Structures are given as structure tokens and as C-alpha cells.
């Protein structure tokens, strides 16, 4: 029967079996665990390839209801194919093919260009092969019910495979047209050399290959390859033909410009049956096996002269070329921001709509992306699957472990072009660069204060709300931010990780160390515009400026007295509460202020750090030292307003005033 007699015309719906078979030929499924192993770049590549494949099917007259996975990908979601879903159904139910759990790709994505490490899984090979055999029997039963399906399937396969594409390689300005002789599998019957059996139709070979995969795993064609799909077999045959597809005269590149429909890999997981004859290297994935084979033969996949990456599918090459050329074709209509991939644009647009469809069942918090929700949920479970081999610290995400390990290696790839400072993460570099640009994107709606980081804004807003969610397990004290809690805990542990290289003094936080180091360099970066006085740190500078403004924002609720600094108010309030939290370990005497405790402890140690240069007399505290120096200078700063007499000390002036009263 001619192939076109029973073939569906463009726009005509085929049977459910036909639709499912054809769509599976361009589908790759991942389980939740496998999807989590892919990085963000691999996921975006998967999304773009799947969407492009679907559009190509529509362009050749293949009309079906939009699959659920396409709906998800258009929304920027990932394909969550869970094990145990999509059970076997009859042909009449519209299911014809392999369960997603049987079409899983072992390890990383098949379209990734570089060969990854081998993926070791605990899946039982024999149970998978048994299920594959059952699938073959199911397909045979469907075939007996629908004799016309074979010719329709053959027609559709030919139509897809013979679709010609014009590929423009912009680096050289040439159009490359694939030869019609490329489709070698359509010019002769599909044949298995190791069995000597020929088949008339693609589907017969598909069934036969799957059946014999369970029986003859170790039997080979040319070098140990077993196929479960006829398109995979045809693809493999081309590696032995030595055909040069389309050669570029100007650059000498040889490109196999095939259609962009990705191949559905169906190979038993965990079995190392793909062996390269050139190097003897064993691969667990077909895609990894084909990549080196194409390099050994005269056939070459798409290559880039600018880098070493190799791609076996054109859509991946197109996306990668955009990265090299910095082409951003997808533009946001709201803000004008441009993106290389459509999936990135879809994800970005949710920031304008404020749509957060993914909600945590534990706390009700919502997220833009599924990946963000999954990352958040680990905070509730406390699960930390990834452990650092150096220090044993655990992490809930592999990406967080990779970032952490750079602390041990000292690796800092991201360098600031302005000041040369290097960072372990690109996001940290971007945050740092806002210091140079002055950009403060995060603004408080209550007081208008702007911040460089969103985390700083969130911590600041808790000043207005009074929220202190982080509580110390040792003393019960609460803090508005996690970093403040971690810093506070060092009081209990005595940890001082930041050490001065000049004098060896240790500090609980980096900012105190930075301030201290300026005492060695003499640097005073903050200068008062009113009086010209300079300060080593911003906090003291801000405190000083309130002297000129007269502002005293901190008021005591008991007596109404106002103070410039919050710390002064806290110290003052201890007069009303009689609280003395600072206790001497030697004599158990208590003090309301920490500086008073330090001065007191010098009585026990005998330390007198303040020495008079005139007479050599030493003092335990600065105030007594300053009083003593007025004897040598003759300075009497405290004067009586009634008689004008001057005194060296304020206490003596107070005693003198009693004469006038």
C-alpha cells in the first residue's frame, strides 16, 4: 500500500495511538530526583528544546491537544514525572508507548554537551527489562487491532524526518541546506546485523529491538550498542557510513544539520552497554556514547570555533550561539529587559505580575518558581543531603555545597572591575558593584530609607513592626535578623574568629576588626562637615553629628530624659531598674556598664595603662589620667557662674557652689 493513501492530511487528527507514538519520539522525561540533579542552565535548555520541538510538530500539520508538559514549560515550570505514575492502559485509552518511569534518562540531561560522571543507581535492571518486555507485548496487541496504524505511522515519521530546515551560521553569513540523501534510514529496510532480521516498518523494528534488549543485552551490531528505537538505530548507522553531510568551504567545518527534534532515549538504567571502539570508554547514556563516536568518524556534530563545546542538536547550538554573540531576542514589554531564552523571560515576567503560584503547605509562603518552593521546604524538613568532605558541614542544596567548598579552595572567579575585589559568587559581585554605582533598589515604604540588598530591607522593616523572629536558645534574647543572632551567640561560646594581623587582638565580627585595624593605619575616613573632626567608623561619626543637630531621639519612659544614642538610654534605664549585668569573676562585684567592669578588673590585675609623660605617674582609667594632666597644664575648664573662679575637676566645682547657696 502506498504510504500516502492512508496518511492523515495536515490538520487531520490521527488516532490516539498515532498521536502518542509520534509525540514520544520528541519527548524526554525526568523523575523528580533526576530533575533536581540538573543545574539551572540544563533546565532552561531542556525547556527551550521541548517547546521548539512541539512547535516543529505543529508546523508539519501535527495537531493534538496541547500536552500537560508543554503547559507546564510555557509557565516556566519543570516536568515532574514521578515514578509510579502513568500506568499501562489499553490502546483505546489513548496511551501507546512507554511509561515515563521507563523512559527516564540516567543521571544528567541527554542534551548536555560535555560528558558527565557515571550515574550509579539502585534500580533493578531485570525489573526494568521485564517491564520493557510487557510494553512490547502491549504494542503488539495494539498493532493487531489497528492494521492501518502502521502505514500512518510510517507516513508521519517520513514527513517529520524529511522536513528540511535552513540553518544560517551567522559567523560566516552562509545558508546551509541538508541533502535529501541524509535520511539513509528511508532508502533501505531497517536491519539488525547481529540477528540478520529485516523489517518493513519502523514500528516493527521498534518492537523487535525492545524485545531483544531483554534477551540479548550483550549482543552487538558494530561495537556493543543495543537500540530500543528505530530512529536511534538509524542515527547509529550513520556513524559507520562515513558520509560527510554538509561541508563549509570557507571554514572547513562539517555539520550534520538534522532536524531539531530531540531523540527519546529508552535504555535500561544503570547498565554500561555503550562502548566506544576507539578508546574503550564505557557510557551509561546513549547521548554520551554518540558524542565521542561522531568525533572519531568523519561525521561531526555542530561545533563552535570559539569554544570546545559540541552539540548534537541544532536548537542547543542556536541557544549557545546567542550566548557567544550576546543576542537577547526575548524582551519584556513591561521594563524592556532582554533575555537569551524564552523560559528566562517567562520567569522574569512573574516579577511584574507578582504572581506566586507555588505555596508552601507548612507556613503559607508563596514563590515564583517551583525550584524556590522546593528549596524553601528544606527549611521545614531540616534535610541536608549534601555534606562537605572537608569540614562535614551539611547543606540541603548541592549548589549551596558548591559555593561553600570555595571557602576551602580559596576560589574567587568573580572580580570587580572597579576595585579588583574578588568574590566566590556572581550574585555577591553584583551586590558589591552597587556600592560603586550607588544603586539602592530596595526602599522602605514606611520611612523611605533605601538599601542595596533585599535582606537588609527585610531586617530594617522589623524595626517598624517590632518583629524579632530569631531567638537565642541560651538566654532567650530575640533578634530581628539571623546574622545578629549568630553574632550574639559568640558571647556564649566565646568565639572570636576575626583576628588582627598586627596585634593579634580578636573580635566577634568583621566590622569591629575593620574598625580596629584603622587604629594601626591611622585612617579616619569619616569627617564632620561642621567642625572637621574625623572618625574611623561611621557609627561614631553618626553619634558625633547629633551634637551639632541637638537631636536626642531616645527618651526615657520613666523620667523623660533624652539621649543621643540608644546605648546611652539602655545604660540610663538601669538606674531605674537597678540592673547590674556585668559581674566581676574575682570579687563578684557587679556594674551597670561594661567599661566600669573593665576599669575595676585592673585593680585585681594591677594594670595601669595611662602614664603621665610629665611625671611618670600611672592610672587605671582615662578620666583620672585627664584630671591629673590639668595639674601640669594649669587648665581649669570648670568655672563658677557666680564668681568666675576656675577648677580642674567638675566635682570640685559642685562643692564650691555650695558656698554661694
Swiss-Prot record:
A zinc finger (C2H2-type) spans 330-352, 358-380, 386-408, 414-436, 442-464, 470-492, 498-520, 526-548, 554-576, 582-604, 610-632, 638-660. Keywords: Chromosomal rearrangement, DNA-binding, Isopeptide bond, Metal-binding, Nucleus, Repeat, Transcription, Transcription regulation, Ubl conjugation, Zinc, Zinc-finger. The gene is ZNF81. It comes from the Eukaryota. Signal peptide: none annotated. There is a cross-link at residue 266 (Glycyl lysine isopeptide (Lys-Gly) (interchain with G-Cter in SUMO2)). GO terms for cellular component: nucleus. Belongs to the krueppel C2H2-type zinc-finger protein family. This is Zinc finger protein 81. It is linked to A chromosomal aberration involving ZNF81 is found in a severe intellectual disability patient. Translocation t(X;9)(p11.23;q34.3). May be involved in transcriptional regulation. GO terms for biological process: regulation of transcription by RNA polymerase II. It is found in: Nucleus. Residues 21-92 form the KRAB domain. The keyword Metal-binding applies. One of its GO terms (molecular function) is zinc ion binding. It comes from Homo sapiens (Human).
Amino acid at each position: 500500500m502506498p504510504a500516502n493513501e492512508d496518511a492523515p492530511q495536515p490538520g487531520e487528527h490521527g488516532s490516539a495511538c498515532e498521536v502518542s507514538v509520534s509525540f514520544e519520539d520528541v519527548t524526554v522525561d525526568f523523575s523528580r530526583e533526576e530533575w533536581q540533579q540538573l543545574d539551572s542552565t540544563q533546565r532552561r535548555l531542556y525547556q527551550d528544546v521541548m517547546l521548539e520541538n512541539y512547535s516543529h510538530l505543529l508546523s508539519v500539520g501535527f495537531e493534538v491537544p496541547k500536552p500537560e508538559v508543554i503547559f507546564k514549560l510555557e509557565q516556566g515550570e519543570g516536568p515532574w514525572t514521578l515514578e509510579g505514575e502513568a500506568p499501562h492502559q489499553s490502546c483505546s485509552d489513548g496511551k501507546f508507548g512507554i511509561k515515563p518511569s521507563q523512559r527516564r534518562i540516567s543521571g544528567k540531561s541527554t542534551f548536555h554537551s560535555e560528558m558527565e560522571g557515571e550515574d550509579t543507581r539502585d534500580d533493578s535492571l531485570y525489573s526494568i527489562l521485564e517491564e520493557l518486555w510487557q510494553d512490547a507485548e502491549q504494542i503488539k496487541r495494539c498493532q493487531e487491532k489497528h492494521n492501518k496504524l502502521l502505514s500512518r505511522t510510517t507516513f508521519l515519521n517520513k514527513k517529520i524526518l524529511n522536513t528540511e530546515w535552513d540553518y544560517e551560521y551567522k559567523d560566516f553569513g552562509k545558508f546551509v541546506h541538508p541533502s535529501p540523501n541524509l535520511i539513509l534510514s528511508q532508502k533501505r529496510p531497517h536491519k539488525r546485523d547481529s540477528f540478520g532480521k529485516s523489517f518493513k516498518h519502523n514500528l516493527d523494528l521498534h518492537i523487535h529491538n525492545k524485545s531483544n534488549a531483554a534477551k540479548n543485552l550483550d549482543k552487538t551490531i558494530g561495537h556493543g550498542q543495543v537500540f530500543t528505537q528505530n530512529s536511534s538505530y538509524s542515527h547509529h548507522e550513520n556513524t559507520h557510513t562515513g558520509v560527510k553531510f554538509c561541508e563549509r568551504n570557507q571554514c572547513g567545518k562539517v555539520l550534520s544539520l538534522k532536524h531539531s527534534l530531540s531523540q527519546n532515549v529508552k535504555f535500561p538504567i544503570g547498565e554500561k552497554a555503550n562502548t566506544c571502539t576507539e578508546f574503550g570508554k564505557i557510557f551509561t547514556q546513549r547521548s554520551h556514547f554518540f558524542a565521542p563516536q561522531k568525533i572519531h568518524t568523519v561525521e561531526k556534530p555542530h561545533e563552535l570555533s570559539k569554544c570546545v563545546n559540541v552539540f548534537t542538536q541544532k536548537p542547543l547550538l542556536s541557544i549557545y550561539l546567542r550566548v557567544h554573540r550576546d543576542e537577547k531576542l526575548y524582551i519584556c514589554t513591561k521594563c524592556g529587559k532582554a533575555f537569551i531564552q524564552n523560559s528566562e523571560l517567562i520567569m522574569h515576567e512573574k516579577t511584574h505580575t507578582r504572581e506566586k503560584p507555588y505555596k508552601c503547605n507548612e507556613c503559607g509562603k508563596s514563590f515564583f518558581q517551583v525550584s524556590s518552593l522546593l528549596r524553601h521546604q528544606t527549611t521545614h524538613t531540616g534535610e541536608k543531603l549534601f555534606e562537605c568532605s572537608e569540614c562535614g558541614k551539611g547543606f540541603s542544596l548541592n549548589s549551596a555545597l558548591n559555593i561553600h567548598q570555595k571557602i576551602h579552595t580559596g576560589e574567587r572567579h568573580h572580580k570587580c572591575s572597579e576595585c579588583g575585589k574578588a568574590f566566590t559568587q556572581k550574585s555577591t559581585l553584583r551586590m558589591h558593584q552597587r556600592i560603586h554605582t550607588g544603586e539602592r533598589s530596595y526602599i522602605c515604604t514606611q520611612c523611605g530609607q533605601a538599601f542595596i540588598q533585599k535582606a537588609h530591607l527585610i531586617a530594617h522593616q522589623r524595626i517598624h513592626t517590632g518583629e524579632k523572629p530569631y531567638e537565642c536558645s541560651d538566654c532567650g534574647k530575640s533578634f530581628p535578623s539571623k546574622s545578629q543572632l549568630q553574632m550574639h551567640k559568640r558571647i556564649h561560646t566565646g568565639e572570636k574568629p576575626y583576628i588582627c594581623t598586627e596585634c593579634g587582638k580578636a573580635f566577634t565580627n568583621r566590622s569591629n576588626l575593620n574598625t580596629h585595624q584603622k587604629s594601626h593605619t591611622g585612617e579616619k575616613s569619616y569627617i564632620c562637615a561642621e567642625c572637621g573632626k574625623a572618625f574611623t567608623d561611621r557609627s561614631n561619626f553618626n553619634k558625633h553629628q547629633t551634637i551639632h543637630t541637638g537631636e536626642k531621639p531616645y527618651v526615657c519612659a520613666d523620667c523623660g530624659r533624652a539621649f543621643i544614642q540608644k546605648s546611652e538610654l539602655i545604660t540610663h534605664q538601669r538606674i531605674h531598674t537597678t540592673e547590674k549585668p556585668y559581674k566581676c569573676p574575682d570579687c563578684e562585684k557587679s556594674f551597670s556598664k561594661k567599661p566600669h567592669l573593665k576599669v575595676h578588673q585592673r585593680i585585681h590585675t594591677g594594670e595601669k595603662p595611662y602614664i603621665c609623660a610629665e611625671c611618670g605617674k600611672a592610672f587605671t582609667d582615662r578620666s583620672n589620667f585627664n584630671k591629673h594632666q590639668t595639674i601640669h597644664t594649669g587648665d581649669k575648664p570648670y568655672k563658677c557662674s557666680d564668681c568666675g573662679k576656675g577648677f580642674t575637676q567638675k566635682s570640685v566645682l559642685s562643692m564650691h557652689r555650695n558656698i554661694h547657696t
